[in-house]
């Protein structure tokens, strides 16, 4: 039996006021739309040009009026235009049909590849999974990337903050993670572009096609769906596009029972968009001008990203830190939700060590003996203490030279340099421009390899043999090749 249509569906109202992206609409008495319902406004402006936009109801004002936020530009909108209550929240297409496609906040394809033949749509607003549905046992999410798996392991169904400036390899790291989850875990990914540059969104799409993550010939074989609300969009779109991407990811988790990767770039822009419309909605600004509902807004998004008994959504969120101030309310609120942080270092990138993940600054709540095991924990801490000692000695080396160090310190420096090189690895998605085949390294191989370096079993091998390889067997093979070439 078909469900009854909502009582307010199809009710027509009239636009009474427009202030930037915020508009007031008057409806007949007793037929007001519900909060978060989508309103559809279509008509022609004074110049005879067509105007069509969707707005989301945010407040009921009294006097039969509602206040709504537009999801696209309000140019040409005039008072007296008709607004139709759709009777439901904004809904987006979900399922396999979304793979390989680019959507806007309303779930409309924007890649000129024709309509999307999705068998289902889902509303972008829903409650987080119940406590009884959650997977409570912490489980490490293996990425196949040595530096992450060893020193800052990701939690399955957890949230990771990705910190890094321009040109240090954020995009390549994201692509590799998408590639690895598809090949090793049979999972798919959803990318939410929130308030970042349109050029970057286009570049990412082209790079996904080049690396095979999006199969241009057969879109059904693609491994990622893209949802963009870039920085030229009104704040309404930037405020909701993260939820549109999350809704697509939730379908893969709950219906297809898959492990999903959700990328959000950039989570700060989601907060920023909320603060832009908050004052227009008549709310009193809070600390540093942010919306008073900051904690709730972030919490509603983050609490839906989790592991259930059916599947998981593991989220990697790029975090922009305004003026490098970690105490700013936006990043500070985000940090409370993160299980791990992956910090990309310009210093490592300039040395040619990729992925340029900083082994000392990156952290994870999973790195504890009860979760990862005693051997993994001890190896990770020994690697970090060796690298920390090397960092402390660098000033002495720069002034006095390596020869002035004690025998022990020289050995530490030698091993630390090998560890630093061994933390690099060739990526599958970078094969096209490095010419080196990518490597997925199992966690056991990673731990065994670093243990051998720390124990001094590989002190006789040249440092260069550890650079851009997978496991220790490849190190030994590379060392033999270097020795043969030197003869």
Swiss-Prot record:
Membrane-topology annotation of the record: Peripheral membrane protein
Main location: membrane
Molecular function GO terms recorded: ATP binding; ATP hydrolysis activity; proton-transporting ATP synthase activity, rotational mechanism
Subcellular location: Cellular thylakoid membrane
The enzyme's E.C. designation: 7.1.2.2
Keywords carried by this UniProt record: ATP synthesis, ATP-binding, CF(1), Hydrogen ion transport, Ion transport, Membrane, Nucleotide-binding, Thylakoid, Translocase, Transport
One Gene Ontology CC term in the entry: proton-transporting ATP synthase complex
Domain of life: Bacteria
EC supergroup of this enzyme: translocase
PROSITE patterns: ATPASE_ALPHA_BETA
Binding locations of ATP: 164-171
Catalyzed reaction equations: ATP + H2O + 4 H(+)(in) = ADP + phosphate + 5 H(+)(out)
Subunit structure: F-type ATPases have 2 components, CF(1) - the catalytic core - and CF(0) - the membrane proton channel. CF(1) has five subunits: alpha(3), beta(3), gamma(1), delta(1), epsilon(1). CF(0) has four main subunits: a(1), b(1), b'(1) and c(9-12).
HAMAP family in the cross-refs: ATP_synth_beta_bact (MF_01347)
Role this protein plays: Produces ATP from ADP in the presence of a proton gradient across the membrane. The catalytic sites are hosted primarily by the beta subunits.
Family classification: Belongs to the ATPase alpha/beta chains family.
Name of the molecule in the record: ATP synthase subunit beta
Organism the protein comes from: Synechococcus sp. (strain WH7803)
